[in-house]
Amino acid sequence: MFYDADGRMWMVYGSWSGGIFLLEIDKTTGLVIHPEADEANNVDPYYGKRLLGGGHISIEGPYIMYDEASGYYYLFVSYGALTSNGGYQVRVFRSKTVDGDYVDMNGKYPEKSAQHQNFGLKLTGNYKLPSLEKAYMATGHNSAFVDDDGRMYLVYHLSLIHISEPTRLALIS
């Protein structure tokens, strides 16, 4: 849930293969304001507007925040699987309007493609330093916030790979 620049409340949601959707929420009742169907613009009266994904592409965990200074909405998503070979990661896209189109730093719209590494600005991913026994993996499902001093933080989960089994943690970067 988040508020746009005009104070309207929205919910962004979606998981794995279905895509990422956006619905407006009535601030007074907390109920969905169902949009009119508009197939040409990827709007379903029940699901809302499809922002990206679908077609069995591994994308989930969306989060949108508005940056007043730039006038952009930033859409964070998690791509990939919970694997140790470069899988789960956070990528970000931006738009001047709450309902998109959300594009990456090269102005590219994230197509329905398993090649998610070709889209978005990668913020987190797996890594293991050769000198360490532990590795970070499966970073994702983030939120973000800006503190009173204007510093932005990313909150996400990850797994630490130990010799015997993975451990789940939440981090703030």
Predicted features along the sequence, with ranges:
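Carbohydrate-active catalytic/glycan-binding domains of CAZyme proteins
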Residues: 1-164, 168, 173
